[in-house]
């Protein structure tokens, strides 16, 4: 799939971003336009959702070691309510969480 070289979200991503609210923003990570949220020591990347049928993927990254995801959810349907519920749970668990080398 070809992605735009600009930092513009697709219409489907814009709808999801609007649904998620002002705590989320657009970002460009590894050449892909994504939805992003900073949680302090962790960050959330919401990938995919570029077209009507493309699934959504959610990644939680430890900001001190960005080579390692600490949680991921792949091939999620574009069910905004379900995605928001999952993200709310992730936010509760990772906001202000101290780094833990035993994860």
Predicted regions and their residues:
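Negatively charged, low-complexity tracts enriched in Asp/Glu with abundant Ser/Thr
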Residues: 1-40, 61-81, 97-103
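C-terminal alpha-helix
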Residues: 89-93, 97
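A short, structured beta-strand/loop element
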Residues: 42-63
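A short, charged, amphipathic alpha-helix used as a generic interaction element across diverse proteins
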Residues: 79-90
């Amino acid at each position: 799939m070809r992605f735009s070289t600009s930092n513009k979200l697709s219409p489907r991503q814009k709808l999801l971003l609007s649904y998620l609210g002002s705590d989320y923003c657009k970002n460009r990570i590894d050449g892909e336009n994504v939805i992003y949220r900073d949680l302090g020591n962790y960050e959330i990347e919401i990938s995919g959702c570029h077209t009507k049928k493309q699934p959504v993927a959610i990644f939680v990254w430890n900001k001190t070691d960005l080579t390692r995801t600490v949680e991921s959810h792949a091939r999620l349907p574009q069910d905004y309510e379900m995605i928001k519920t999952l993200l709310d749970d992730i936010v509760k668990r990772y906001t202000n969480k101290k780094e833990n080398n035993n994860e």
